[in-house]
Amino acid sequence: MIFTEITDDLTGAADSGSYFTARGRRLKICVSGDCDLSREDGQLLSVNLSSRNTPKDTARSLHRSLCEKLPHHGNTIFMKKIGTGFRGNDAYELEGLLQAWPDYLVFIIDNAPDLGTFTLYGHQYCEGQILPKSVYAKDPIFPPKESFIPDILGHDTNIPIGLVDIDAVKGGSLVEKTRAEIKRGCRILVFDAITRADTLHIIESLQPLYPKVFWTGSLGMADGLAQYLLSLIHI
């Protein structure tokens, strides 16, 4: 299985990449989309687009253009790294990815258990605080004003956004709820996740069923995907 990560800043590429290298994987970080995107056998690839603070249309076009350079097939796991607290051009970046590859979906799992960050009933919490009251409320550029992720993204995109809440994740109806949201026309799905186990459960349950997905999130997503890739090696 091939792995490619797309990030919106270089620090995020290094931070999220550390979860893979800590598990013994080799990682190549490209500082821009104009770099050589080739890789050695078994090497993971992370491409930084520095799009967090660019104009919105630029963020969209950078992601669309990168997809046009990458292999388009189902044996690659893609991760889209975003900043905790949705303090950037996330909706525009996701639009660019989905415009380039109309047969793909976006699955968002935004949690980082070590930092007290999680998603519950679609609302983002950071360091245990609801997003607008969290430490990110002091962000000088993108201070969050609301916490419900589908609404945050929905202000900047017309792509239908669905929610798979914690009741489905923990209650045994994860696959059924995901299928229903996709059937409803949603191309972006937000998943509740509180613990590491939640994230890994979502990935393990859905990746074999939906190989054409941009797995989107922050450090918790990187941790979950790194563990999932490790399990594939040991099968």
Predicted regions: what they are:
Residues 1-2, 26-30, 43, 59, ...:
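Cap/lid and interdomain-hinge subdomains that line or gate substrate/regulatory clefts
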Residues 2-40, 111-114:
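N-terminal basic/disordered segments at the start of proteins
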Residues 3-7, 106-108, 214-216:
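Short, hydrophobic/glycine-enriched beta-strand segments
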Residues 44-57:
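Short, structured active-site "lid" loops
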Residues 196, 216-224:
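A C-terminal functional module that forms or caps the active site or interfaces directly
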Residues 205-212:
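Soluble secreted/lumenal catalytic domains
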Residues 227-228:
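N-terminal extension/subdomain marker
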Residues 233-235:
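Conserved small/polar residues in nucleotide/adenosyl-binding loops
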